[in-house]
Design a protein with these regions (language model features):
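Flexible, compositionally biased loop and terminal segments
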Residues: 1-295
Length: 295
């Protein structure tokens, strides 16, 4: 299957008909399961992203926000490492979001991510995001109690209202020059178990493990239901969700890379045209440098 068709399959364009179960975490789309076979494609994607980021930075009219959501061990860090490895760090910022601090709890639920949005010309990557407020907080109602919300802000329709708030927030960003791409790295429960065991077996990765990871597995079905509701309610043409099969890491890297490249190419970014006084200064500088004696 060619990449454009793969992206169409992964992008949630008709959220009203979306079913998480229709997306197989182990799907390979006909791609080789041997990572060595796809390394050339990955390398080409990295090079193209590097070029597009240079145009984004020089153009300075657009910001890019990449949202990564997934269960523990779904491969969010790996996507950042392997897909964005060619991007200039000066034009890219990565933010990971953990349990909220006391300061964050004193603000509205979108405040934490709002203050970390990328500026024009830059790429912002959210490793988890404001969507935790309709995922983890929904699965764990005790987290909601910590937010000290007024009674009128809490009720059976709170999640629908939060979905609406998120969509309004993202529409505002889109209208003002932020390209938003959201990726749900879909991993199977069995593959997560294998990756947890691999972490425990490898001393260099044990630091990533938390007993809470095992405890959260007991709520797997609740999380899947929350993800399905979230994607159905918040996948829009201006901020689409992509459901990425993540049991095979390199497949996830390829698809995420292709989605970012496709979206950036759609912006038709060009380097600024130099003319007038600025062009005259460049030509003057060129003449002066050529006139200097070497050595």
């Amino acid at each position: 299957m060619k990449l454009p068709k793969i992206l169409k399959h992964c992008r949630v364009d008709e959220p009203g008909h979306f079913r998480l179960a229709a997306h197989d975490p182990a799907e390979c789309f006909g791609l080789s399961t041997n990572i060595d076979d796809v390394k050339p494609i990955l390398a080409a994607g990295i090079a193209r992203l590097e070029e597009l980021q240079q145009r984004l930075y020089a153009n300075g009219q657009w910001a890019v926000l990449l949202v990564l959501q997934g269960m523990d061990a779904a491969g969010k860090d790996g996507v950042i490492k392997h897909v964005m490895s060619g991007v200039n760090p000066q034009g890219c910022e990565v933010h990971g979001f953990k349990a909220p601090s006391e300061e964050e709890l004193r603000h509205d639920f979108l405040w934490t991510t709002t203050v970390r949005l990328p500026e024009n010309g830059r790429i912002g990557i959210f490793n988890r995001s404001h969507y935790e407020e309709v995922l983890a907080v929904r699965v764990h109602p005790e987290m909601l109690a910590r937010q000290k919300l007024p009674l009128r802000a809490v009720g059976k329709d709170i999640w629908q209202r939060r979905f609406q708030d998120i969509c309004t927030f993202e529409r505002h960003l889109s209208r003002n020059g932020t390209l938003i791409l959201k990726f749900h790295l879909r991993i199977s429960r069995e593959e997560q178990r294998k990756r947890f065991l691999a972490r425990l077996d490898e001393p260099a990765k044990r630091w990533k493990f938390s007993m809470n990871d095992v405890i959260e597995r007991k709520r797997w079905d609740e999380y899947m239901a929350a993800y399905e509701d979230m994607i159905r309610a918040t996948s829009t043409d201006y901020a689409p969700w992509y459901v990425i099969p993540a049991d095979h890491k390199h497949v996830a890297w390829l698809v995420v890379s292709a989605a970012i490249i496709e979206a950036l190419e759609g912006l038709k970014l060009e380097f600024p045209t130099i003319k007038g006084k600025a062009l005259a200064e460049i030509k003057s500088a060129e003449r002066a440098l050529k006139a200097e004696k070497s050595g």
